[in-house]
Every structure is written in structure tokens, then in C-alpha cells.
């Protein structure tokens, strides 16, 4: 299909040549008015012809004069065209690069005039929370990559200032539990529902049961995938046969528990009991344990049951192989042999699927020295993203009423979140964002391999707080680009006479060299926002935030007592109606 001719685009550049043609008609008129019969005579008296022709300012419309005007305009147009084709392309003062540091006017279109409706990036730069600004060109996702070495202030200069904005629901990874203590009272003061999951001290934690969020067969597969990705089995290194076999068994058992067990038994404790009951006799292939009998009974009722189909595939393994699979499953679920962990996963209090309904603060406290139970944090994030995306699509027409921000401190230490590279690209439209906080970009690459670049690419904002990891410094150096600078050289030659020389030239220089990045001032940071020049700015001064006075940093009396908060029991009111259930005999 041919594109329609753009008349406007064709006419506008040629309008000046119309005036040239009209003016050039005077040349033809002057030649005609000049006295003389031949060329030499007319050339001799040409000035008289010009005087006669320019007695009137109007162009001549004599046919000969019009031909002269058109010819002159065409010649000039041709000359301009030829010169343009052969023109040299100069970029004055940009010969070796155009990199520069950002200025206030560069960030201005991306900032919401209302301070609390922004993501705090640096002391002078912010990013509006709205995903649909008036000017679509300024729309950016709220995913942020924060990189900074130990002690660079990732929590103080980024996580806590953004928590104090109070414009969203927050899910905060909290190494050591300090953020919850310092900010918990602020959240309660502003009407937030506060939830705590503590993998360091289970006695100071709400309960979390992954089984509570299983609503379909695909939810079972997602849970098993997360469990496999973040726990260690006993299979042979480099052989994924054992993982696939374990996946079949986990899927079958969890499917059975979800569809057949009473609600109070749908938890990891029941799963452990199932695995413990799976006795295998290598010398008797016909032996059936209690789990075999349970599935046999289910198959008699529902031959095409999801759990039955998975279990039949598992039972294809010979006795010795099945025993190895069971051992591998037992090793993977060994942490659940701890009574405290079994108890904390008996039922659910986190209500992950409600984070987008009302303002909630969920603090995920984990150890920064021992990763034994960090797989639970990864499991929470995996279920959280999937639950909120599904609820946004199925209930709210694609967008959650309350934005959910995940501030994932020590992102590399919580384990792998399956399909994070896809989630980072799709959660924006559902009013969800993720801030990945790392000590070095190499941590992300070690965990997510080839998908790390995709994850980084889906973060429109990135902040470097300082560090000395070579890979991070090299990538940042390349991303900042080169600027063009002026240099001069002086020379002196001595002989019979002394002569001096001075030469000026232009060179390309890195906007920030690797050694400059390595010794970055502790109070400075580098912000990169997609489509905007990078900013060399001060880190945010947390003491200047309007809500700082409500943190325990400002006043120790504002410290949030987690144990006291969790021990609070409901006090019934006289005018309220409650449902009472009989738990039965224990």
C-alpha cells in the first residue's frame, strides 16, 4: 500500500524558491528593457535596464521573464540540494560524546508537585507515583534497582524514606528486623494494617501457610516450583532427573492434600506426614503403603483426578529409585521437621491477597547471616506477585485500588523468585512495583543467570550508592558514556633560537571513570532514570522528611514492640456479633 503524498511536507520547504523565481523575473525584464540590438549592446546598457525594471516593485509576468525566474529558482534549488548532499556533519563540542550530568530542568517533568505522591530517589530527584501522567512521554515504571556496598546506606537513604511516603501498601524485606522496629509505629499511626513474618524468631511472627493460597492446579505447580528452586534436595549434581521426580511427588501429594484433606490439615505438617508414611520395599514391588492405599481409593472414585495422574507417573519408578526420590524429598523438607516451623505454617494470618485492597505494611524479617529459612521469604514473594496480579485482573479490571510496593532489601539472599524477569515486566500495569536492593549487580547474575539483564532492564530507575565491585563499576562507567573536553599542549624547542608552540584539541573523556566511581563521596549517589541524563546528587537526608519525627531514630519511644503487638488479643465488644466454632477434642 502506497503512502499518501504529504503535500504540506513538499510545499513548505520550496516556498522560498517561489519568491526567488518572482524576484528573478526582474532579471529577464531588465534584459529586455536594456537598449541594444545584440548581446554586447544590451550588456553595456544593462544598468539602464535594471533602473527601468525596478521602477515597479511588482514581478513581471511576461512569458520570457517567467521562464528566466523559474530557471534561476531551479538552479539555486539544485545548488542547495547538491551542497546538502555533500555537506560535512559537524557536532560542535560533541565530537567524542554528549554525556553530561542531569540538571533540575531534566527531572522536573517526572516529579509530582505533591511531595508525598512521589518515589524518593535522591535529595533533589523524585519520581511521580502515577502510572498515567498527563504527558505520556514522562510515564516510567516504579521498579528501582539500588546497588550499594555494605555500609553505603541502602536502608537509611532509600528504604526508610520511601516507607515514610505512606502512599502505598508495602512489603519490606527486613534483615535483622530493625526496619519494623523503627517504622512500625509510624505505619500504625497512619491506619496501616501491620503484618510480621519473622524467620529469625518464629515466636515473634504471624503465621504463614502457603497452602492457604492454593485455589487451582496451576497454583500447586507454582508452589512446587518455588519450593524446588529455593531448597536443597539430595539428588545427584548436574542430573535434573531427581528434581523432576520430586516435582511429580510433591505435586501429587499437595494436590491430594488440597482437594481431599480438611482445611485445618492443609499445610506442610501434613505433607511431611505423607512423606514419612511412604515406606518402600526394594524386594517387594507389590507392597503398598498407606499413601498408596489412599491414592488407590481416590483413583477408584476419580480416575482422572489431578493428584492421581501425578502419582501414577511417580509410581513408574522402581523400588530403589522411588526410595531415592523419597530420601531426596525428605532432605529437601528437613527444615519442616523443626516444631517451630511446622507450627508457624499450620495456618495463615498474612492475608497476602488483600495487600492491594487496603493499606498494609508487611515486614519480612530474615537473617542476613543464615539462609536456612530464607526460602520461605522467596515463597511469600512468589505467591504474592501471582495472587495480586490475578486479583487485579479478575476483581479490579486490571489495576489494584492500592499500589503495592515491594522493597526487597538483600534481594540476592532471599532465594530465587521464579519467573521474576517476566513479573518485573508485567506487574507495572497492575499497580505493583519492586525495588531490588543489592550489594553488587553480580549477585543478581549469580542467582538469575542470563535473566539478570532482563530484570535490570525492567527497572526504569537505578541508584548507585557507592561500592568497589569491579563488575558493577565497569557497567556503570559504560552506561554513563563519554563527554567531549578541550585540551591543549605546550611545547618548547631549543636550538640557536627558542621556539614555543601551543596546540588545542578535543578529546573524549568518561563522564565518571572507574576509579572516580570507586572513590565516590559517601554522601553522593548516581541516579539513572530511563530517557534522562544521569544525576550526581546527594543521598536523601532522612532527617528532613516530615514523618521522620515518628520513627524510633528520632525518638526511642517510637520503637515498635513486635512481641507486644502480636500478643494483643481481641477484646469482644457488647454490641458485636461473633461466630463461634467448636475445635473438637485435641
Regions found by a protein language model. Give the residues of each.
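Basic- and hydrophobic-enriched, low-structure N-terminal and domain-boundary segments
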Residues: 1-152, 156-159, 203, 482, ...
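P-loop NTPase motor domains
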Residues: 23-29, 137-432, 447, 515-539, ...
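General secondary-structure edge motif
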Residues: 99, 126, 142-143, 309, ...
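A short glycine-/small-residue-rich loop at the edge of a beta-strand within enzyme catalytic domains
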Residues: 109, 115, 375, 411, ...
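Low-complexity, polar-biased intrinsically disordered regions enriched in Pro/Ser/Thr/Gly
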Residues: 128-133, 232-241, 263, 486-506
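Conserved ATP-driven motor cores of ASCE-family P-loop NTPases powering translocation/secretion/packaging/pilus
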Residues: 424-526
Amino acid at each position: 500500500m502506497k503512502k499518501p503524498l504529504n503535500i504540506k511536507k513538499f510545499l513548505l520547504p520550496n516556498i522560498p524558491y517561489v519568491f526567488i523565481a518572482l524576484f528573478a523575473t526582474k532579471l529577464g525584464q531588465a534584459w529586455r528593457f536594456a537598449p541594444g540590438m545584440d548581446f554586447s549592446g544590451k550588456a553595456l546598457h544593462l544598468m539602464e535596464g535594471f533602473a527601468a525594471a525596478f521602477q515597479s516593485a511588482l514581478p513581471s509576468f511576461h512569458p520570457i521573464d517567467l521562464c528566466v525566474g523559474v530557471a534561476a529558482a531551479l538552479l539555486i534549488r539544485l545548488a542547495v540540494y547538491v551542497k546538502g548532499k555533500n555537506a560535512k556533519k559537524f557536532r560542535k563540542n560533541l565530537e567524542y560524546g554528549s554525556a553530561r550530568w542531569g540538571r533540575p530542568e531534566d527531572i522536573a517533568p517526572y516529579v509530582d508537585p505533591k511531595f508525598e505522591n512521589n518515589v524518593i530517589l535522591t535529595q533533589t530527584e523524585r519520581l511521580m507515583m502515577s502510572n498515567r501522567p498527563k504527558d505520556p512521554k514522562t510515564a516510567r515504571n516504579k521498579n528501582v534497582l539500588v546497588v550499594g556496598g555494605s555500609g553505603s546506606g541502602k536502608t537509611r537513604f532509600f528504604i526508610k524514606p520511601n516507607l515514610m511516603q505512606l502512599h502505598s501498601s508495602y512489603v519490606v524485606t527486613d534483615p535483622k528486623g530493625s526496619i519494623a522496629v523503627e517504622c512500625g509505629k509510624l505505619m500504625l499511626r497512619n491506619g496501616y494494617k501491620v503484618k510480621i513474618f519473622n524467620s529469625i524468631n518464629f515466636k515473634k511472627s504471624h503465621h504463614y501457610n502457603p497452602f492457604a493460597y492454593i485455589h487451582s492446579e496451576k497454583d500447586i505447580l507454582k508452589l512446587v516450583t518455588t519450593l524446588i528452586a529455593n531448597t536443597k534436595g539430595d539428588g545427584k549434581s548436574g542430573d535434573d532427573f531427581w528434581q523432576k521426580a520430586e516435582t511429580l511427588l510433591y505435586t501429587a501429594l499437595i494436590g491430594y492434600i488440597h482437594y481431599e484433606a480438611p482445611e485445618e490439615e492443609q499445610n506442610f505438617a501434613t505433607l511431611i506426614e505423607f512423606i514419612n508414611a511412604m515406606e518402600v520395599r526394594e524386594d517387594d514391588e507389590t507392597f503398598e503403603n498407606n499413601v498408596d492405599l489412599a491414592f488407590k481409593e481416590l483413583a477408584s472414585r476419580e480416575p482422572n483426578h489431578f493428584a492421581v495422574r501425578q502419582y501414577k507417573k511417580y509410581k513408574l519408578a522402581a523400588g530403589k529409585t522411588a526410595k531415592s526420590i523419597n530420601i531426596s524429598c525428605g532432605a529437601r523438607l528437613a527444615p519442616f521437621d523443626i516444631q517451630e516451623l511446622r507450627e508457624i505454617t499450620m495456618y495463615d494470618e498474612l492475608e497476602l491477597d488483600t495487600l492491594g485492597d487496603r493499606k498494609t505494611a508487611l515486614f519480612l524479617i530474615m537473617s542476613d547471616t543464615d539462609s536456612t529459612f530464607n526460602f520461605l521469604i522467596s515463597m511469600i514473594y512468589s505467591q504474592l506477585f501471582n495472587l495480586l496480579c490475578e486479583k487485579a485482573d479478575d476483581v479490579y479490571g486490571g489495576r489494584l485500588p492500592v499500589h503495592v510496593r515491594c522493597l526487597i532489601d538483600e534481594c540476592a539472599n532471599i532465594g530465587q523468585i521464579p519467573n521474576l524477569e517476566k513479573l518485573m515486566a508485567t506487574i507495572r500495569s497492575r499497580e505493583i512495583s519492586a525495588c531490588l536492593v543489592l550489594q553488587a549487580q553480580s549477585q543478581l547474575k549469580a542467582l538469575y543467570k542470563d535473566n539478570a539483564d532482563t530484570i535490570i532492564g525492567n527497572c526504569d530507575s537505578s541508584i548507585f550508592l557507592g561500592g568497589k565491585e569491579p563488575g558493577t563499576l565497569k557497567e556503570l562507567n559504560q552506561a554513563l558514556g563519554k563527554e567531549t573536553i578541550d585540551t591543549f599542549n605546550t611545547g618548547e624547542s631549543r636550538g640557536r633560537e627558542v621556539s614555543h608552540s601551543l596546540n588545542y584539541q578535543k578529546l573524549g573523556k568518561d563522564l565518571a571513570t572507574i576509579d572516580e566511581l570507586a572513590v565516590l563521596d559517601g554522601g553522593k549517589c548516581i541516579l539513572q532514570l530511563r530517557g534522562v541524563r544521569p544525576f550526581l546528587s546527594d543521598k536523601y537526608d532522612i532527617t528532613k522528611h516530615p514523618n521522620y519525627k515518628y520513627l524510633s531514630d528520632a525518638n526511642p519511644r517510637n520503637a515498635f514492640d513486635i512481641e507486644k503487638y502480636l500478643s494483643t488479643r481481641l477484646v469482644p465488644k457488647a454490641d458485636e456479633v461473633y461466630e463461634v466454632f467448636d475445635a473438637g477434642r485435641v
